[in-house]
């Protein structure tokens, strides 16, 4: 599994349909920019509001377009273990390289329940499983000790860590060095990716890289190579854009940003709505200041 920067990509819409022409151009833009991986149908890809048929079509389209150049990882999380297994099996049948599985939301399982959830999924699929911890969205936090229990299952290969808790990340890094050093830890927060990699993490699964892929790749590569001065310089330059992309619920701002770059409309599906006037102003200025939009 990759080290570096992977994009959690948008899903472009045209009216109420998937805009495959824009998706094709967008995936090419990502690949040409040197991105290290693509996460399709995650939070940023508006997975909750695509139909089962659309899911299959989107996965097949992305796998074919990428053609093995980078890993294609599909979001298959659910608060039903059986449903997540079904989605994960389908993703692998359609050619995915891995699945990204968010912790179950709303029903708030215990740490034992979380372990059994991931264990059941991992045992049901032939490929890589990545845990996704984002308690701000799910209402549940998978703690480092539980993550490391999961890491002892061979095909659970890493975690997208978006708790926002650096102490928790540090504890995870400390523990994994003893249990399974090759287990990957990616930041799920763009504004903390530099710090996570400097602490020994493996990269970022990024929203920022939807609009600044080459810069994100360069920043993470520099940090992984130990060129902290270069990585810090890029991080600080991009920091206002990182913040701008989250002034409203993701993916509202980034959908507007990719629209400005020419990758389809800014259409989102309800209950998400288009960016406010203030968000548009802030995002556009941040893009211009960072040099990603002229």
Swiss-Prot record:
This is 4-hydroxy-tetrahydrodipicolinate synthase. Its main location: cytoplasm. Homotetramer; dimer of dimers. GO terms for biological process: diaminopimelate biosynthetic process; lysine biosynthetic process via diaminopimelate. Pyruvate binds at residues 44, 205. PANTHER family: 4-HYDROXY-2-OXOGLUTARATE ALDOLASE, MITOCHONDRIAL, DIHYDRODIPICOLINATE SYNTHASE. Its EC number is 4.3.3.7. Signal peptide: none annotated. InterPro entries: Aldolase_TIM (IPR013785), DapA (IPR005263), DapA-like (IPR002220), Schiff_base-form_aldolases_AS (IPR020625), Schiff_base-form_aldolases_CS (IPR020624). GO terms for molecular function: 4-hydroxy-tetrahydrodipicolinate synthase activity. The active site is at residues 132, 160. It is an enzyme of class 4 (lyase). Coiled coil: none annotated. The keyword Lyase applies. It is found in: Cytoplasm. Catalyzes the condensation of (S)-aspartate-beta-semialdehyde [(S)-ASA] and pyruvate to 4-hydroxy-tetrahydrodipicolinate (HTPA). The record marks 43, 106 as: Part of a proton relay during catalysis. Pathway: Amino-acid biosynthesis; L-lysine biosynthesis via DAP pathway; (S)-tetrahydrodipicolinate from L-aspartate: step 3/4. Pfam families: DHDPS. It catalyses: L-aspartate 4-semialdehyde + pyruvate = (2S,4S)-4-hydroxy-2,3,4,5-tetrahydrodipicolinate + H2O + H(+). GO terms for cellular component: cytosol. SUPFAM superfamilies: Aldolase (SSF51569).
